[in-house]
Amino acid sequence: MKKYISIISSILVITSCDVVEGPYMSDTTNPPINSTTKKILIEDFTGHLCSNCPDAARELTAIKDIYQDQIIGMAIHVSTSFARPYSASQAPAFQYDFRTQWGDNWDDFYGVSEAGLPRGMVNRMGYPENHKLGKDEWASIVANVLNQEPDFELTISSTTDLITINSEILNSINGDYNLVVCLTEDNIINWQKDGANNVEDYEHNHVLRSVLIDEALSSSSSYISGQEIERLINYDLTALEQSNINYSENTAEAGNGNAGNWNSENMSIVSYIYNNITKEIMQVEEAHLNN
């Protein structure tokens, strides 16, 4: 999976570099967003043809209402059964393809949809046996994890073509860690099955759009408290959008190429650090994409 993502990223992401312990300042309109407390990523594996999936989305919203910015959500549309677009003969219903190559790769690796949707992962904890969680299991795990002391702090800032991620080590630690940078989009109005209803104007939020990088946080496995690692990522939103369209049209099963019409005004950057052995997400942060 990582090899495939790395190949795609090398085409669409112009540059990605890291500088250790450098006091840099990005020229950006957006103020940096940083995480000093433990934050949690809830990955909601879903599909617009999944009639029970809106209940999971509402559960995620309820958890976020309680814990506010400590909870970051990501809706990952997966599987031919639940996320394929309908044929053109059934237009206008369910014509959009929310799937991405990264979401499909994650689903293949973690096997979430094979357990039935809706289902999700909370910081990818419990892998490889107990990570595929029903929505009613999310809240209790969140409550247990939020009080943990974080080992990393993430700061995100962006311009129209550059994303800057600063990772600060809060506690000296050894391990094999990766840094991931994703783009998500809110307020996508489109079809969704919700119980017995086909809702034409359902609001889809924090939908995974793209993954810019998934690569080693550092060349070293030893991290020292106070150390900072800065990653600069140039991106081309138009090229990333076209990649999704091409994936839907040429690769995704039953795809139709209707995967564009991104609205950059509604997009966010989600970045996280995960343990490459256990797959557990150690820290996550989110910031609006400055466009």
Where are these regions (language model features)?
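Bacterial Sec-dependent N-terminal signal peptides
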Residues: M1-Y4, S9-E43, S51, N291
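Residue-level signal for short, function-critical loop segments
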Residues: K2, H48, N187
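Alpha-helix termination/capping residues and helix-transition junctions
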Residues: I11-I14, Q68, E114
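Intrinsically disordered, low-complexity boundary segments flanking structured domains
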Residues: D27-T29, E59-K64, A139-N144
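Local sequence-structure signature of Cys/Sec-based thiol-disulfide redox active-site neighborhoods
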Residues: P31-S81
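Short, conserved sequence motifs used for protein processing/export or organelle targeting and
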Residues: A75-N291
